[in-house]
């Protein structure tokens, strides 16, 4: 489950930002997760709760905003929505798609004390 290591990385960022911005508690973490990022959302929620125990983010609420996958089709030259990597272009059927969005995972914002 790579979501656990993702959550550990998020916690590390939270701790660094707490030192830099001088806050002591995290109430809410909002993430943007692309549909093509390969993240299992249920595992992410679980991992976040486990990793954050006894830290500045203990009990923090995790909110995830999922971003749609987007690709550029080399076959027809269109920007298209895709739900999974290696899907065919919904317009022309080509498999020559280059992902241009929806593969990110980033902290959008925090609520802190």
Swiss-Prot record:
Q: Where does Ni(2+) bind?
A: 2
Q: Name one GO molecular function term.
A: nickel cation binding
Keyword presence, Metal-binding? yes
Q: Any one Gene Ontology biological process term?
A: protein maturation
Binding annotation for Zn(2+): 73, 76, 89, 92
Cite the Pfam families for this sequence: HypA
Give the domain of life.
Answer: Bacteria
Metal-binding as a keyword? yes
Gene3D superfamilies, sorted: 3.30.2320.80
**Keyword terms, alphabetized:** Metal-binding, Nickel, Zinc
Q: HAMAP family in the record, alphabetically?
A: HypA_HybF
Q: Which family does it belong to?
A: Belongs to the HypA/HybF family.
Q: What does this chain do? A: Involved in the maturation of [NiFe] hydrogenases. Required for nickel insertion into the metal center of the hydrogenase.
Q: What is this protein called?
A: Hydrogenase maturation factor HypA
Species of origin reads Alkalilimnicola ehrlichii (strain ATCC BAA-1101 / DSM 17681 / MLHE-1)
């Amino acid at each position: 489950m790579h979501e656990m290591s993702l959550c550990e990385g998020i916690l590390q960022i939270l701790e660094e930002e707490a030192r830099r911005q001088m806050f002591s508690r995290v109430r809410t973490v909002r993430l943007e997760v692309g549909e093509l990022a390969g993240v299992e959302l249920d595992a992410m929620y679980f991992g976040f709760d486990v990793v954050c125990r006894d830290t500045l983010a203990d009990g923090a609420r995790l909110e995830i905003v999922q971003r749609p996958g987007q690709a550029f089709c080399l076959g027809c030259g269109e920007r298209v929505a895709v739900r999974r990597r290696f899907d065919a272009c919904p317009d022309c059927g080509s498999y020559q798609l280059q992902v241009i969005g929806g593969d990110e995972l980033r902290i959008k914002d925090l609520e802190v004390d």
